Amino acid sequence: MNTYPVAELTINYDGMSTRLMYTAAQLVIVSDAGYKLWYVEIDGMTQHSLLHMFNQTDQIGVALDGVTADGKHFSGTGFFHPNEQHYAAAIRGDSELPGF
C-alpha cells in the first residue's frame, strides 16, 4: 500500500466542476495479488452543502483531477462517499489510475 498526500483535488459531476476544500487528503494505492485499487480519503471538508447533496442522492459517480503534494498529477473516475457527521469523504476508484 502506498499513500500520497493530496495538495489539490477537483471533482466533476452532473456537468459541474468543484475544487474541494479540505484540511487533509491522501491518495491510497493498494496493490495485492496482481490487482490494484485506489481511493482518496478527504478530511476536514468545508463544503457542507456538497457533502449533504451527495448524501441525498444515489448518483455518486465523479471524475476527478488532482495533484499530489510532490507535484504528480492524476485523473480518474470513482464514487463519492460523503460522511457528513465527520466533514469527510472518500472517493473509491472505479478505473485504473494511470501512473500509479
Regions from the PLM with identified roles:
Residues 1-34:
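Solvent-exposed edge beta-strands and adjacent loop segments
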Residues 2-5, 45-47, 79:
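Signature of dsDNA virion morphogenesis modules
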Residues 5-14, 55-69:
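Short conserved beta-strand and strand-loop elements enriched in small hydrophobics
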Residues 17, 26, 46-48, 70, ...:
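Residues that cap or initiate secondary-structure elements
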Residues 22, 67-97:
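Short beta-strand and beta-hairpin "edge-sheet" elements
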Residues 28-36, 80-87:
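Short, ordered beta-strand-loop transition motifs
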Residues 35-53, 98-99:
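Charged, amphipathic alpha-helical segments
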Residues 39-41, 63-65, 88-90:
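Beta-strand secondary-structure signal
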